Amino acid sequence: MSIFCLAAYFWLTMVGGVMADNPERYSANLSSHMEDFTPFPGTEINFLGTTHRPPNLALPSNGSMHGYCPQQTKITTAFKYINTVISCTIFIVGMVGNATLLRIIYQNKCMRNGPNALIASLALGDLIYVVIDLPINVFKLLAGRWPFDHNDFGVFLCKLFPFLQKSSVGITVLNLCALSVDRYRAVASWSRVQGIGIPLITAIEIVSIWILSFILAIPEAIGFVMVPFEYKGELHRTCMLNATSKFMEFYQDVKDWWLFGFYFCMPLVCTAIFYTLMTCEMLNRRNGSLRIALSEHLKQRREVAKTVFCLVVIFALCWFPLHLSRILKKTVYDEMDKNRCELLSFLLLMDYIGINLATMNSCINPIALYFVSKKFKNCFQSCLCCCCHQSKSLMTSVPMNGTSIQWKNQEQNNHNTERSSHKDSMN
């Protein structure tokens, strides 16, 4: 419940903060439209236009063409800083939360199993996005231009940014699918108690997920380039998708539908299918004595299934507004419509909400695990308390023959914690 309240808070924050067009805001999302990279106000191309422009594009400065809204729009300073604060909060929470989650799974042997390995893979993908992509987002928001836009490093960032962006989302989507399949396998073989350790098939799945995510993101690295264009008599450069081959033109035409189908619908359909099969298995297999003997084991598996389902629901809530905005823009918008600017205002509002909710998905999974899973909650608390205890011990410990009593006690406490955590490890 706390997770949904947090999401609602950010939603209302963005509704209240959106004042006008945001030409400087590079969207941390699945879209690669030209408007997301153009830092210049006053043109409709900033929001809808097209992702393909010739290298020597000249934009009219009088706004008289049908493709431009008559009134120049600009973003308020307050809205800039609201978005900056939100991005910085997501950066801190995402970095601390995902790094702590990885540390918990790495340091506790009892946590090294199939489901937790997939959750660690999910956290690592989110951590990469938070550490690398979010700082670029904040820079574009405040500076109103692409970083290092006049040298080779800017070109490198122009290709790296969308590549990592799409790879991170692919890692999230495929890990959620793998978790759903893993939960079905666990229930289908519910009489088998899994030991500690990562199964070989799970390790193969994780490697395949990362390789496939990188492969699917290659068109982003190929298509995005620094494109010079003239605006109000000045030559500028911006990072955008510039289709120069038939394949890239095809990719550009079907991109919105491809993103919606593969990166959004697929994990939801996969979860629905395998959770339906899992429910049927649990209803059909009711062996009385064996079921009683494994009742505690089944409770643990149900808790893991509930955790995975919660992660999928959060993913859907965070990404749906953004995909809805892109699909509406693809199907409803008409350049020749005289009332298109009113539609743009509505779609822009949805775009901002979707962008921030989608970005928030990179930091919310550790929070969800804290509230949904008792074992992860205990591990998070133990990890944080351990860090505080270590800091205090370093200041108060008394050396004895080159050692410290506190370190010995801490080692004993860690051994007891690991032994107690082994009793309720996820299966």
Curated annotation (Swiss-Prot):
Keyword Phosphoprotein appears in the UniProt entry: yes
InterPro entries: Endthln_rcpt, ETA_rcpt, GPCR_endothelin_rcpt, GPCR_Rhodpsn, GPCR_Rhodpsn_7TM
Keyword Signal assigned: yes
Transmembrane segments: 81-102, 113-132, 160-181, 206-229, 257-278, 307-328, 348-372
Annotated keywords: Cell membrane, Disulfide bond, G-protein coupled receptor, Glycoprotein, Membrane, Phosphoprotein, Receptor, Signal, Transducer, Transmembrane, Transmembrane helix
Comp. bias (Basic and acidic residues): 416-427
Annotated membrane topology: Multi-pass membrane protein
GO biological process per UniProt: adenylate cyclase-inhibiting G protein-coupled receptor signaling pathway; angiogenesis; aorta development; artery smooth muscle contraction; atrial cardiac muscle tissue development; axon extension; axon guidance; axonogenesis involved in innervation
Any single GO CC term annotated in Swiss-Prot or TrEMBL for this entry: plasma membrane
Residues bearing glycans: N29, N62, N242
Signal peptide feature range: 1-20
Compartments, record wording: Cell membrane
Extracellular side: 21-80, 133-159, 230-256, 329-347
Residue ranges annotated as Cytoplasmic topological domain: 103-112, 182-205, 279-306, 373-427
Pfam families: 7tm_1 (PF00001)
Region Disordered: start-end pairs: 408-427
Modified residues (Phosphoserine): S425
Example of a GO MF term: G protein-coupled receptor activity
Disulfide bonds, paired cysteine numbers: C158-C239
Xref: PANTHER family: ENDOTHELIN-1 RECEPTOR, G_PROTEIN_RECEP_F1_2 DOMAIN-CONTAINING PROTEIN
Family: Belongs to the G-protein coupled receptor 1 family. Endothelin receptor subfamily. EDNRA sub-subfamily.
Subunit structure: Interacts with HDAC7 and KAT5.
Role, per record: Receptor for endothelin-1. Mediates its action by association with G proteins that activate a phosphatidylinositol-calcium second messenger system. The rank order of binding affinities for ET-A is: ET1 > ET2 >> ET3.
Protein name per the record: Endothelin-1 receptor
Organism encoding this protein: Mus musculus (Mouse)
